[in-house]
Every structure is written in structure tokens, then in C-alpha cells.
């Protein structure tokens, strides 16, 4: 079975990339159980708590990330350098229980996946 990685690199609500990535992630979960989810660059904003998308008249799809463990998707990683570059503390509460890793460690984890989809 192919190992599939989803890499979120774009901020939420500025484009549909994050929402489309989440939809693809949920659909893929029906086909394989070996899924890894990575948050890099502006993608780290996808899983920050306390967002209020309704204030900009956007749909709140961020809360859907919370249900991923119900679909047996429970491998999440966040780039430590991306958090630091954006002034976000590594210990800030996230929507998901994600492990914070260095860029080198993320690259190593990502190298074990057969398919990489970027959103």
C-alpha cells in the first residue's frame, strides 16, 4: 500500500487550497491508512486555535481538522522553523496533537512517503 503525505503550505482563508487539501485528505483516508500530514510555511496557520473565519465571512473548515483522528489519521507534524519565523510559540495549543520537528527531521519523515500532495 502506498504511503501518502499531505503537506499544507498555504494560510487558511486566503485561498481554497487548505479546504481542498482537507477534503482530499478525508477522501484518501477511505483508500489507505498510511497517511502523514505536514504543516510547513504558512500552512502552520491551518491548525492554530482561536481563529474566527466568520468575521471575514469565510467558512470555518479549520474545526474539521479535529475529526481526522476519527478517520484513523493521527500522524501530524509541524515545522519548528516555520512557527519561529512567524513568531508563534512551539507550545501554543493547536487544533491537532501535532509533533513539532526541525526542517531536517521533517524532510527525513517526508522521504518515507511514496506520494506527496501539497496544498
Curated annotation (Swiss-Prot):
InterPro entries: DsrEFH-like, Sulphur_relay_DsrE/F-like, Sulphur_relay_TusC, Sulphur_relay_TusC/DsrF. Keywords: Cytoplasm, tRNA processing. It holds the Pfam family DsrE. GO terms for biological process: tRNA processing. Belongs to the DsrF/TusC family. Heterohexamer, formed by a dimer of trimers. The hexameric TusBCD complex contains 2 copies each of TusB, TusC and TusD. The TusBCD complex interacts with TusE. This is Protein TusC. It comes from Enterobacter sp. (strain 638). The lineage of its organism: Bacteria, Pseudomonadati, Pseudomonadota, Gammaproteobacteria, Enterobacterales.
Amino acid at each position: 500500500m502506498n504511503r501518502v503525505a499531505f503537506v499544507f503550505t498555504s494560510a487558511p482563508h486566503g485561498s481554497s487550497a487548505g479546504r481542498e487539501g482537507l477534503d482530499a485528505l478525508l477522501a484518501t483516508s477511505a483508500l489507505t491508512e498510511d497517511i502523514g500530514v505536514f504543516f510547513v510555511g504558512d500552512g502552520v496557520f491551518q491548525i492554530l486555535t482561536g481563529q474566527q473565519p466568520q468575521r471575514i465571512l469565510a467558512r470555518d473548515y479549520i474545526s474539521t481538522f479535529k475529526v481526522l483522528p476519527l478517520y484513523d489519521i493521527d500522524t501530524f507534524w509541524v515545522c519548528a522553523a516555520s512557527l519561529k519565523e512567524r513568531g508563534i510559540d512551539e507550545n501554543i495549543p493547536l487544533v491537532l496533537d501535532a509533533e513539532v520537528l526541525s526542517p531536517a527531521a521533517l524532510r527525513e519523515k517526508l522521504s518515507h512517503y511514496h506520494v506527496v500532495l501539497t496544498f
